[in-house]
Amino acid sequence: KNISFVNIRVAHEIRGVADKILPELYKAGRFQNTLIVSPPGFGKTTLLRDLIRQLSDGNAYGPGLRVGVVDERSELAGSYRGRPQNDLGMRTDVLDACPKALGMLLLLRSMSPQVIAVDELGEEQDLRVLHMAASGGCSLLATVHGAGEEDAARRLGGEYMREMFARIVILIG
């Protein structure tokens, strides 16, 4: 077969990209379940990466939290030989190249995270495990593809999405 093009994406961190929205994600010093929505290429993963770091290290709005990250496609941590190449914070545990639903279950059962962070929700199985995590007192931080809240609601189930996420951040260009 002939190759018609090659697309190489290089994950990199941009520190401080979450600074402006961070205060909106807390209520009375507690991080609120947050969903980030945007079309591809708008910076969801970059924003997620910086939010994970700031939640883990602590910030002006709350103390550092234990964050569990399921990095299914190795985009968040950029792990190489088991070591994250991007800074996700000092209290972050990363499960690299692990399916989201399985990784979230492993984190819940063995790592006692205060926050679970995942990129690109979509599978029904992911949503079931997220619901289980939220029911167990774990905070959620996730992204989903969509042009806005309506698209995200169609993908995740509108009532379910609004019940699960107290904050919905929509990135527009």
Question: Which residues fall in each region the model found?
Answer:
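Conserved P-loop NTPase nucleotide-binding/switch module
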Residues: M111-G173
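P-loop NTPase switch/communication element
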Residues: S56-L107
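A general structural motif
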Residues: R15, D19-K20, V94-L102, L121
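Hydrophobic anchor at the beta1->P-loop junction of P-loop NTPases
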Residues: I36
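Hydrophobic positions on the alpha1 helix immediately C-terminal to the Walker A/P-loop
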Residues: L47, L51
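The conserved Walker
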Residues: P40-G41
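P-loop NTP-binding catalytic core
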Residues: K1-N33
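Conserved lysine of the Walker
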Residues: K44
